[in-house]
Amino acid sequence: MIDKKISPATVCLLMTLWMILAIIIGFVIKSVVLVAVFLLPVVVYEIYRTKGEFTSLSSWLMLAVLIGELIFIIFGINYNLAEYFGSQDAYIAGQYVPLGDIKILGPTLMAVFSLVLLVRTYGPYTKWLSVIIFVSSLIIIYILNPNAFQDLLKMVIHNNSFNY
């Protein structure tokens, strides 16, 4: 549909510029909601682009997590998953994911799902979109809680989590 009117490269370039704008404004005004809302069309286009069984599932899960993340942030829902599960991390989709405030888990899961797409998709545009989503997810974590961002990086380095 959209690819017949506008080339995927043009759409991905526009999505990249769109998210750069969102990240800059989000940093300046410290708004996670702004970055997350701007990320919605990127994730929706990723869903449109993915065709495989697991990649489509990963794309749809990202959308569900992003919508959940927006609900948690807008309504100020705080829940400490580490206390609930009695563990500081969980092994999800082949990656160790830190547990803590549920609002940090959402973008962390999105980063993991985007890495799954980066590795499992064949198309250059779905890979491009997955990188946009990955970077945006990390930015969301950083704006939410810079300390949680540092902890996530330490965990990744310590566990070598993203070694495919």
What residue ranges belong to the model's regions?
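Transmembrane alpha-helical segments of multi-pass membrane proteins
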Residues: 58-73, 130-141
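Canonical alpha-helical transmembrane segments
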Residues: 38-62, 113-115
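Hydrophobic alpha-helical transmembrane segments
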Residues: 19-29, 44-51, 72, 115-122
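Short, aromatic-rich membrane-interface segments at the entry and exit
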Residues: 27-38, 55-58, 125-131
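C-terminal membrane-adjacent module
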Residues: 102-164
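Alpha-helical transmembrane segments of polytopic membrane proteins
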Residues: 30-40, 92-109
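Alpha-helical transmembrane segments
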Residues: 6-20, 62-67
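C-terminal TM-helix exit segments that contain a strictly Trp-centered aromatic cap at the helix terminus
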Residues: 67-82, 140-152
